Amino acid sequence: METNSSLFGLVSPSSHDLVIERLASVGVPKKYRSKRGLVEFVRANPAKISELVSALLPTDDDVKLGLKEARERPRKSAVSPTMKKRFRESMNMLQWLMFQDEPDVSLRNLAKLNLDQRGVCGSVWGQNDIAYRCRTCENDPTCAICVPCFQNGDHNSHDYSIIYTGGGCCDCGDETAWKPDGFCSNHKGSEQIRPLSENLANSVGPILDALFTCWNNKLLSAESSGQKGARSNDTLVILQKMSNELTFIVVEMLLEFSMSSESLLSFVSRRIISSSGLLSILLKAERFLDQDVMKKLHDLFLKLIGDPVFKCEFAKAFVSYYPVVISEVVKQGTDNAFKKYPLLSTFSVQILTVPTLTPFLVKEMNLLAMLLGCLSDIFVSCSGEDGLLQATKLERLCETSERVIGDLKFVMSHAIVSKYATHEHRELSRSWLTLLTFAQGMNPLKRETGIPIDEENDYMHLFFVLGHSIAVIHSLLVNGTYSAASDEEIENDRNAKEEFDKCDGDGERYAKVGRLSHEDSVCTAIVSSSSFDSSMASEVHKIDPFHALLPSSAIYLIRECLKVLETCLGNDEGISKFLCKLSSSSGRNIPESKMSWPRRDLLNVETGGSVSSNLASSSRDPSTGLSPLCGDIQTNLSLDNVCGPYGVVQTDVTADSKRVSCNSADLTKNASGLRILGLCDWPDIHYDVSSQAISVHLPLHRLLSLLIQKALRICYGESASYNGVSISHEIPHADFFSSVIGDFHPCGFSALVMEHVLQIRVFCAQVIAGMWKKNGDSALVSCEWYRSVRWSEQGLELDLFLLQCCAALAPADSYVDKLLSRFGLSSYLSLNPDITNEYEPVLVQEMLGLLIQILQERRFCGLSTAESLRREIIFKLATGDFTHSQLVKSLPRDLSKSDELQEVLDDVSVYCNPSGMNQGKYSLQSSCWKELDLYHPRWQSRDLQSAEERFSRYCGVSALTTQLPRWRMIYPPLKGLARIGTCKATFQIISSALYYALQSGTSVKSRAPDGVLITALQLLSLSLDICTQQRQSNSQDCCLENSIPILELAGLEIIGIAQGTEKESLLSLLVSLMKTRMGDGRHQFPEPGSCNISSWIGNLLKKFSAIDSVCMNLLQSLAPEVVGQSGFDKVMSGSTSDEKRKAKAKERQAAIMAKMKAEQSKFLSTLSSSMDDDDPRSEFETSDSVMEHDSEIAVREVCSLCHDPDSKDPVSFLIFLQKSKLLSFVDRGPPSWDQCPQSEKKISVDGAPDLLRMNASSDSLRISSPLMLQLSDDTISESANMIESIKARLIGNGQTEKRSSDGRGKDESNMESLEIAMYQTVRNKIENMINQSLTRVDHQPHEAENCSEKNSVGGPSTLQGRFPDIRSRQTSRRPDAGSDGFHPIDCDGVYLSSCGHAVHQSCLERYLKSLKERSGRRTVFEGAHIVDLKKKEFLCPVCRRLANSVLPECPGDLCSVSKLQDSPRTKLRRKDALQPSLWLSEALCLLRSAAEVIEDGDRGKTVTPQGDGPRRKDLKSVSKMLWDFYFPKPEDKTLKRLWLPPQSIVMWDTLKYSLISMEIGTRFAKNSMLPVYCIDSLYEELKTSKGTILSVLLRVVQSSRTKNTIHVRQRFVGMKHLAESICYGVSSSSSSSIFGSEGTTGSLKNIDLLWNRASDPVLAHDPFSSLMWALFCLPFPFLTCEESLLSLVHIFHSVSLVQTVIAYCACRPSELSELNFGENLLNDISNALRESGGWEYFRSNNMDLSCDIKDTIRKYSLPFLRRCALLWKLLKSTPRKLHEESDMFDLPSDPTTDNMDFIYSPQSELNHVQELEKMFNIPPIDIILNDELLRSSTQIWLQHFQREYRVNRVKRSLCITPVVPFQLMKLPNLYQDLLQRCIKKRCVNCTKVIEEPVLCLLCGSLCSPIWSPCCRESGCPNHAITCGAGTGVFLLIRRTTILLQRFARQSPWPSPYLDTFGEEDIDMIRGKRLYLNEERYAALTYLVGSHGLDRSSKVLGQTTIGAVLH
């Protein structure tokens, strides 16, 4: 074949033929060319294995043919075999050779041998899988195990947490990652892996070796072709395709092996290792293989590294490959290249965190040196000409640098590695210091003084993130540096210390300052001068006590850090200029300096260290082994620098000229040999922060600070006593610093080390003052981040400690003068009262605050760990109450991990348990407020102000005068700080501030406003505290002067001499200021936390007097009232002033009371005069008028929009109508979490088919529109004829007609008179029956059966003959009786609520119109993110709650007919009864009599029809919305226009359902899951606006249901059908054969639904619903008749009783024959069910069969009685103001109030039943069960129901439910159980994995949120419509929070799961165990169950429409 032939130019032969051809070419006979034949051939010819494997694998030519087929496949009819199929066939043949049998069978047999015997789990994770961390079992923080391993292990008592994975594998069974005690029962460690059997190993091994050899060769060919370039593109494509396909199939086979046998996997891993070069090329393969192939290869690696041997070899190859990737990325200069190599990110955490492996790699593979070299390469590429990191370059390699630094942290986190880098190979730590020079001073800022710039530094955060990572490495490095030495070394150091204690004489000690021992110089390779005497150094070592505690590595690192820092300091502009001046001289002495340390010549900066030559990098210098670093640090290595017995190499570090701008000369290596930090005199360096560059990034300073503070803590802190060695306090403290900093002079060290740190503090002060405003946000952000909690512990606090160290060593006055100079306040001491610039007061206050912090801060130099914890917690809790995690997060990193944390926290705080929506929080104990530190370094101005206000509120005094800074115990080396507080310079600053305050008073332009004055006085108080402690001290410290300057100068009149004013002293200034401020109290400082400056100054003067006798004498003359007054005089003067204040207060109080009395008298007189006006009406008329309009006055409202109190227009109440499925949820019961999560397209909440829609569309034929119009006219005529007939008959019988007195129309008045007449007729019949003692009604069964043939009440309806044409077109089958007849679409009912505010409908229309116009113009308006204007939603203009309609007020309608009183005989009968009896006869008589009156009137048609009555226009809005809820919109628009919905029937059904929902909402408390059985809880609901709006609705229905003749007739016919059903057990079929088709709409359809409902068997429906429809159909006066209402309650209570008995029997169908109830109602029902069935219709999910049946009956009647009680109370209620005083959903729930109403107990339910039975005069249960009338009626009801049931008309089951509260889904107590069950589940609709699963708490289905949907059907909005009628309550599984959905509206809600500290864990960040908080879950349940989602301001405040929640 020609090599230059085209890739796709050949005709492809069969792949099988090619294999046969190759087998023949290697000598395989024809008879062996099958799978089994090849096995036999291999057995006979083992030497042919290599050739045979090569022949079986596809060749390059096969790949070429495959590529050709792939190109031509779209043009062919048949699909050719793919390349993967060919390779799989080859692998199958190879597996035959390996196992010498069928591969699948062999692998299954191997799996059986290894069943439950796996050593390592190795399960590979994907993104966001669940895993567990266990801090008890893990070997490092990166280890984790999978869920099955965690469940199979015992971790209950361990410290574990849940995490979301980003990849990796399970560590269970891996001894290098997981402790053996934590292994699960299925994995026992890699040593438990059984070796492969010898026979199998002998057969598998050679085949694998040959295969791996071929694999290796193919990969090498692909790599070389890619690097060198192939001869043609075709060749490159073939090689790459071959390597990809072969790798994919081989890895696939090996992964299959790993799933079958761990022994086989281990065997494979050893073979890969033994295959020369394979592992190395596999790691490099990501450079030329496809990503999907590499993904599978990485999965294989994760499986294989479970074997320790393979992990070690893999780690070696990984370390070798690491710098190759970094070099390539740096070469390309972008992170995009790094993303192409995912191996590093995937496996660095797997390798570098292993405690046993990483140290091996560091020592054997120079891992640490390699990482430092990689980081050096990155820093060099990202640095600019000045040698500093640049933001733009660093951003391009951000991810790469983070990876390398992260790996450095992994490596350094091993204690042995950090010790290795600082003790054994110090050149590594030296290299790290050199790398820090790139970050030292990075991102400098310079103040803009010209045109403001709008500079947005998008990369600023990169420097802070880098600084944070560096700080973490510093912490690890310092820990390794100070790691404990051996016991022998400690013992030797103790002996050295004892010898040193015997020595005395300062001269001898000071002569050895800075000298090191010979051994130390060898170890550290430090050469300080050419005259160094090694024997002298050895002597120093013997007498130096600090070497007993401080390891030589720490001293070395401190000095090396100083030398590198010295190099960087030479590049500073200010220091460079200073060095230029000093270049000609050797320095001068500073008189103020008391330190007589030996002066040194200023030498070159030299550093030593043998640099490892193994820093593997292609860009490294071969002579040094180091990568070239930045230009300013260079390494000059030569043999001349080798010195000492060990030949340590010396490296000269010089500063590059690029970093020095002064004459382009290298100033640190000048002719004079200047040594910057060795300056003996205090340097006079000038620097202006406002005009020169400044950087907040000083990693070298921070490392130095860490090293020194750690050394101090070891020598003087808590850890000093642990080693048994303590430093004698007799040793001068200077010895510590001389031992640590060596031969660097204190003056040079202090002045130059503090320089940049001080500049940062000045920069922050200037930013606060507003000097950097023109720089945009860059300066402000840098300042805020520097001072923030997250960064301050890594910068600000360490910088402050450095300032303290420098202050302890520096001359005090020079130090303070430098502070003045850097703050730009040198002119502040001039005493010129004219302010120089606007920023000066802030700068002065910040400088004084810094001085106080330097003096009093003890974080690193005096406080123990417990004391620091206490201080930090108090600091945080002073600003507010916080959760546990917030407190821990606010602590410094080292303190947050302390074991003493919880103990200290409990000691200083009070824990508040979680309640309501509040999390568990800690608050500060009252006794701890006195420990508040106003000068904590991390105070932010806002937090400090809050703390001062809270202090003032809790303690009643000002924090400024009580929480004064104090001088506390400090480590002895830092006692020199005290000189700063008492020096002359500090005295001058304080005096100047007092002088300016006195000269300017309280002027705004004062150079010392109150803020400065208060801070100066606090500094003075601190200085006096220092003086007090010094005077009280028995012995003076050697570093402190015997005289105290501030006391000596306080009385000298030296202030104001130069200004020509009167001379003043500090004391005289204080006295004058005290007298000037004598009158300022709290009234002069209105803000909280103010203080009385005068009294404060008085206290300071007393301190002066107490400390110093000279000051006391001066003060006796200047202020004798302060110093010379006796105690008795003070008390007397104080008591006198108190009496004066009390007298003045009484006078003011009397004046106010007199004024109020006068105004009250004036008002009463006006009111009396108006009441005395003459009234022209008679007394009787006035009384009637008052009675009639009393209710109207009570509910009179003012429009919330126009606020016109004089408007006469009627107002309407704002209401909110919403669909509800609450009743269905209660009937069904809550789902359980342990059910399988499901996601369904349609969910039936009660488990039965949704028949509501079936009822709306029956089998009836549609009626054409013309016929419907004709029908409507006929119906109007018939209705009017019927009404007039009844009216004529009743009036003819002698009834009088009562006229309406409120001005209503004649027709309406006639219909009201008609209903009153009907009511009186029926009542007379009932009275007659009672008088005749009719206790029974003849209800024989045969009468019921034949009653349909009678022309009586139960006779055929008179409507049967109305429409013969239509009847012939209709089917005779009625709709199912399963529904309640009149139902909204897709829900149980409509719930009505109201906020209680009212508007004029005209005002509302204008308001809505304006909202629509603004929405059309896309103008933002309030509530735009909440309301849907298309649904006519809006927010109440007052309370901002949701509304969508209005309900007009209807005063007096309910009471327009006076309540009819019972006859005296009826009262007497009821009163004389011995016990209550069942009023069944009265109820039956009522129904029968009403039906008779209606039937009689229906026969007469003598009156001309009057037409359709008027409809109320003010009900148009609510009626239209209810109509849209109840019925779909008709297709024929004319029908909708002609036939408006009945206003009364839909509102009555809404009233009914709202009452039912209200009753359900009162079954549970707001914060408890226990049921509440209390009648008071029912009535409390009616007192809210919810109950009051129902009263308004009831009056509206009463006023509207008599206004339309069709509607009146509809009610009357419905009443007749209801009476037929109850009294005779007959269902009228006439209406169903006429109306009810799908095409009918309007009133005709409603008539059909109501009549069908009335005709249904009474047992087929809820008894309360039947009661409500009965009251609706009866003449309206019955609603106010107490006796009629009671009788109806009795009969429907009996219906409820019968339904319960049937449900009880339905729960025991097999035991019906065995039940023996006796001769009573129970036995009758049981027999009827056994004979005719029908019990399947009745079901109950809560039936307790163990309870007595009589108690069960009573309990199940409770829902009916409770709803009747609500209705009863509603009918008796009077109109009142509608507003709610507060939002019941937003108030914190009080557990005592909720549970005090009624405590649940088994007997409480029966007690509640007894209370309600007494209210309604219901007799005992035994009387009811034996009532003969009820027994006969029950037979009728049962026969009626069974007849309908047999014809299959009753389909939908009826759920009989007791008083059970509404409950959301029953959730597990432990959240991890729910998380494990719901995560990574597939959607039922689309089968996709739901990335962010959402659990519906209403039905238990798994859904997806709107921001991460898997499909439309499973989305939360669609599911909420299907499941909850638009309402959805979802638990976001990953986030742990709640999502509340209301159609398109959604809002977040707090999590119901809290941890042990009562705190939420959003997104499982902490991953700790979360427990279900019942109180929170109960509050959510109450919110949902009471329909409060759209009425809670908390919910609405977070509501959005369609937005993504984060």
UniProtKB/Swiss-Prot annotation:
GO terms for molecular function: ubiquitin protein ligase activity; ubiquitin-protein transferase activity; zinc ion binding. The keyword Zinc applies. The keyword Zinc-finger applies. It is an enzyme of class 2 (transferase). Its EC number is 2.3.2.27. PROSITE patterns: ZF_UBR (PS51157). A zinc finger (RING-type) spans 1395-1440. Belongs to the E3 ubiquitin-protein ligase UBR1-like family. PANTHER family: E3 UBIQUITIN-PROTEIN LIGASE PRT6, UBIQUITIN LIGASE E3 ALPHA-RELATED. This is E3 ubiquitin-protein ligase PRT6. It comes from Arabidopsis thaliana (Mouse-ear cress). The lineage of its organism: Eukaryota, Viridiplantae, Streptophyta, Embryophyta, Tracheophyta. The gene is PRT6.
